[in-house]
Amino acid sequence: KNRFGAANELGVFEMREHGLKEIGNPSALFLSERQFGASGSAVVCALEGTRPLMVEVQALVANASYGTPQRTSTGFDTKRLQLLLAVLEKREGLRFSQNDVFLNVAGGVRLDEPAVDLAVALAVASSLKDVPLDSGTAVVGEVGLGGEIRAVSRIETRLTEIKQLGFERAMIPKANAKGLKVPAGLEILPVRRLSEALDLVC
């Protein structure tokens, strides 16, 4: 059939006894089982098509017990994870050569956009250091090979979703902060480099 418009929109449905029922607020659903105070957890506002979606990124860094360290990712590109680990090692001095690294996007969602990078990097660093991230902070940003945090698209849409889900702070690229319309009651933490982000939350 002929199709007009974007074809990459996400719909979330729940199977009930009378059939499928749309989930009106999938972000709340994906965060409903989030555990507070645990290291290796970061919340990101991603875009699926034009829809903002809040999801939890979970990381577990453990001592490698079987020789070559493993790099396993569910819901996020494994090669992108390896790239971010290399940036953390080269630019921030973190060491993963003796560690297995496991990454999971909670809720079975697959995240492909670069704006998820910062959440992945912070979740991994949090698990390595065993220091929980602030549960009231959501993050968004692309990480460059030099450790810089690059601007992302539709930042105001993301901030609105972050505020609606009850978060108090949003860590965003500094390049997105100029002239930004911020929802009332939401504190913005602009960062230019990955080192700044790590200093703020780890």
What are the language-model segments listed below?
Residues 1-202:
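Peripheral, non-AAA+ core regions of ATP-driven protein-machinery
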